[in-house]
Amino acid sequence: MTHRGIEVKSDQIKVINNLQPPQNPKEVQKLSGMMAALNRFISRSANRCRPFFLLLHKWKEFEWSKECVVAFQQLKQYLSCLPIMSNPVLDKIIFAYIAVAFYAISFVLIWVDNGIQRPVYYVSKLFNEAEVRYLPLEKAILAIVYATRKLPHYFQAHTVVVLTQLPFKSILRSADYTGRIAKWGTILGVFDIKYMPRVSIREKFSPI
């Protein structure tokens, strides 16, 4: 924490930049642990690190592929210019963006301080085998549910406006849905979450 906001210590970045490509799953696990400590600052961290995560259990078939090489280089480049995060003022409205990929979801919270968008927290998650088969709309709702579990204190202390073109409001309140969507609707219903079109605010820190 500095006078500018919440910043990553330069030593943390230096350690990762000096890392050589992992040679086995244990070294990948070490890298994953380092990245976990920085997840708050990294947009789409699950997408960026997915090539590494896929190697975590491949002791016999471990191969640092070209995809891993590119992802590792791009990650180091991204870490050279991480955003400064900020804690929102109590009772201020927080805005949220969602990004859905085939194998991951990403979520970012921001708040507006005197007209300036300030990022609060990035959240990202790789889907498990069952979640990969969800419909795109279900994946998007899951992103919000996951964020409430990961960052409950923000959702409890603030109104959160999710900026999206998806019809979340009507779907989550519809009596026609059962199963997981109905369950998610109940989970989200305890928070003050609103849904507005993405054009409602100029996008600067969208996770896409």
Q: Language-model features: where?
A:
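Acidic, metal-ion-coordinating active-site neighborhood of RNase H-like domains
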Residues: 1-208
